[in-house]
């Protein structure tokens, strides 16, 4: 059964007024057609029988990609002021880099797409089937990690400035006892090896972030108070901004519903949507954050609270309005709210204290503490530079096949 990925209808949201540009409906249809062309270009690459290098994908796609982005630019510019036009241009420049890079990255997973090599490890199977792998870590080893992290916990407690409203401390690990223990704990349950199998390349530790979540935080609350809209029950459900690099969430304390548990929508990594549109919209969001500065709020998407920005957003073609962090914009009591609530899975510490997942595709949230403080570790992985590929590939020429299918 094909499940469509959630789409927020901003036309019915009380915080957003309809587009002021009369050409918006017509441009929306034309923009959807451009996205269809991008999908025709990149989907065969993503599902290639052989891995393709980023350089090769760029050569294969450059001419058509340039035409598509030029068409998108015309449709996105219409009805906009100078600030939004500048943001759109920056986003399209980034998209010209990210779209081929993402397609090349996914081409390394071709056997997963074709079902030629079933996964062996429980980690890879779970990520393939639901988007996440849940487990319990060794209790003694985790306690040693908690003890090692105590000085850093005190440091997070001492940081109260608005610049650290997540109450988090990110560490890019060099070799050291904390990083080594994190990797040992994850190796014990097969997570790095499972990542290597699923993504068809070795993954290395990239960063880890120590996060304290408590009920006093406001960064996720009441974004649309000015419009009389309360915090959405689905707030902070999102996909991550990147396209590569899986994550692991480790609870460092007991977690119940009151602590802001990790939640996800099982299978959402397979729900039907345009990956090309998702990659493009992530670049638009990133450009919006830089262009539309709002220092008068603690909300983590400050630009969404600017009336001028909301007007600019509504003048964009409808598909380009969609946000990676869509959960904040779902109206309570709506069909979309019911859909998310009926599909979500909540991971309490009695179920699992560790979750490995592909947050760039699988929809998830966490850290929304309602009544008690939660301590957790978020661990990021990235492809190991120059790592040998880990799966046997079919020996067919991917380039010839792709050129034939591109038509």
Predicted regions: what they are:
Residues 238-257, 349-350, 380-383:
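Short, conserved beta-strand element in jelly-roll/cupin
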Residues 7-10, 16, 27-31, 35, ...:
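Non-heme Fe(II)-dependent double-stranded beta-helix
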Residues 379, 384-404:
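Extended hydrophobic/aromatic segments used for targeting, binding, or gating
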Residues 218-222, 230, 247, 258-267, ...:
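A short secondary-structure junction signal
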Residues 130-132, 234, 243-249, 259, ...:
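Extracellular structured ligand-interaction cores
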């Amino acid at each position: 059964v094909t499940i469509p990925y959630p789409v927020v209808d901003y036309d019915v949201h009380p915080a957003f007024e309809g587009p002021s540009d009369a050409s918006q409906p017509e441009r929306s249809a034309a923009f959807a057609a451009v996205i269809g062309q991008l999908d025709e270009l990149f989907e065969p690459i993503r599902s290639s029988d052989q891995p393709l290098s980023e350089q090769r994908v760029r050569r294969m796609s450059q001419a058509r990609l340039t035409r598509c982005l030029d068409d998108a630019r015309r449709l996105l510019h219409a009805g906009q002021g100078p600030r939004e036009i500048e943001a759109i241009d920056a986003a399209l420049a980034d998209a010209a880099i990210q779209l081929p890079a993402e397609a090349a990255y996914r081409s390394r997973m071709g056997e997963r797409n074709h079902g030629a090599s079933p996964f062996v490890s429980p980690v890879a199977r779970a990520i393939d089937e639901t988007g996440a792998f849940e487990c319990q870590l060794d209790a003694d080893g985790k306690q040693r990690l908690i003890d090692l992290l105590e000085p850093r916990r005190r440091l997070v407690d001492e940081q109260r400035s608005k610049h650290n409203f997540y109450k988090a401390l990110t560490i890019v690990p060099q070799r050291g006892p904390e990083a080594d223990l994190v990797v040992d704990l994850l190796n014990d349950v097969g997570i790095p090896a499972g990542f290597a199998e699923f993504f068809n390349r070795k993954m290395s530790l990239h960063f880890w972030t120590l996060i304290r979540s408590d009920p006093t935080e406001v960064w996720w609350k009441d974004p649309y108070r000015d419009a009389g809209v309360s915090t959405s029950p689905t707030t902070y459900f999102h996909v991550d901004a990147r396209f590569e690099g899986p994550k692991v969430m480790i609870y460092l304390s007991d977690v119940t519903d009151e602590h802001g548990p990790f939640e996800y929508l099982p299978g959402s990594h397979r729900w039907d949507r345009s990956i090309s549109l998702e990659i493009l919209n992530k670049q638009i969001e990133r450009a919006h954050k830089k262009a539309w500065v709002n220092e008068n709020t603690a909300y983590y998407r400050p630009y969404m609270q600017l009336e001028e920005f909301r007007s600019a957003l509504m003048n964009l073609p409808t598909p380009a309005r969609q946000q990676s962090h869509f959960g904040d914009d779902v109206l309570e009591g709506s069909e979309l709210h019911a859909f998310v609530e009926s599909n979500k899975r909540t991971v309490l510490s009695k179920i699992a204290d560790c979750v490995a997942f592909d947050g760039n595709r699988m929809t998830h949230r966490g850290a929304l503490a309602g009544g008690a403080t939660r301590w957790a570790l978020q661990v990021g992985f990235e492809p190991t530079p120059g790592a040998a590929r880990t799966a046997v590939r079919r020996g067919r020429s991917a380039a010839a096949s792709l050129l034939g299918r591109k038509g």
